[in-house]
Regions:
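Active-site-proximal beta-strand/loop segments in catalytic clefts of secreted hydrolases
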Residues: 22, 78-79, 205-207
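Conserved, well-structured interaction surfaces
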Residues: 1-70, 83-97, 101-119
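An aromatic- and glycine-enriched ligand-binding surface/loop that stacks and positions planar moieties
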Residues: 1, 73, 96, 104, ...
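Short coil/linker segments at helix-helix boundaries
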Residues: 29-44, 72-92, 141-167
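Alpha-solenoid helical repeat scaffolds
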Residues: 25, 65, 69-72, 78, ...
Length: 238
């Protein structure tokens, strides 16, 4: 539990620093990317805005995960010093408002998966899918409070209705299916779901065989560990 908390807040701290740097050097970044990048045609607005959208989505993903494990957590959105000031836990309403603001921005700035953007980047399809999932979770927390009077789930005063949240989630999913946020469809051959660059994946963590980049779980990513080896211990045939 402590490991998850520490790693996600370290991730958030990195995101906060990146966002501050992007905003401080926007003109220089825009000019350098527009002059050299093959992805120029895929960018919605300026290059920096797209990068900011990607980082804000990833930061929101971290906060969404934290909320699922811990409930209300401190919302830290700016770089802090080595001894940051105390930040109280945010309420559910504050957390979800933050998540929606972050994802709506990302949805307006990130590129579609079929726009020529490099594979592995955050796309509008990934954002829309995560936004739908967030709304479903939000509705479920509200329902829990309504059904059980659960203090952990807090009260529902001033929150969106479960009906509107579920309706929003359905609309987002329908739009994903119909191609509003890129090109996605189910694979006809089930094992193909687990191969790279297939048409069903909306968001994935890229990895390089041999070094495990992007995932702490060695299975399938760390060279010889692809067959189950861990710390030099290999499986043998029966």
């Amino acid at each position: 539990v402590l490991n998850l908390w520490s790693k996600l807040y370290a991730y958030i701290a990195q995101a906060n620093q990146i966002l501050e740097n992007l905003e401080a050097h926007q003109d220089a970044i825009d000019s350098s990317i527009s002059n050299s990048s093959l992805e120029k045609a895929a960018i919605q607005g300026s290059a920096t805005e797209m990068l900011i959208g990607e980082v804000r989505f990833l930061r929101a993903y971290a906060y969404f995960t934290l909320y699922r494990y811990y409930g209300g957590v401190p919302l830290i959105t700016k770089p802090t010093g080595p001894k940051p000031a105390y930040v109280p836990r945010a309420t559910r309403q504050e957390i979800f408002k933050f998540l929606y603001d972050e994802m709506e921005y990302a949805l307006s700035k990130c590129a579609d998966n079929n726009s020529g953007i490099a594979y592995g980047r955050v796309t509008r399809g990934a954002v829309a899918g995560m936004l739908a999932k967030t709304k479903i979770f939000h509705a479920s927390y509200i329902r829990r409070a309504e059904m059980y009077g659960d203090k952990i789930a807090e009260n529902t005063t001033g929150e969106l209705s479960t009906v509107s949240l579920y309706a929003d989630a359905v609309k987002l999913c329908d739009d994903i299916i119909s191609g509003v946020y890129g090109s996605y469809e189910l694979e006809d051959y089930y094992p193909a779901v687990f191969t790279k660059r297939n048409k069903e994946i909306m968001f994935s963590v890229l990895a390089e065989e041999g070094i495990g980049t992007g995932n702490k779980i060695p299975m399938g990513f760390a060279g010889e560990a692809k067959y189950g080896a861990t710390n030099g211990v290999h499986l043998t045939s029966w």
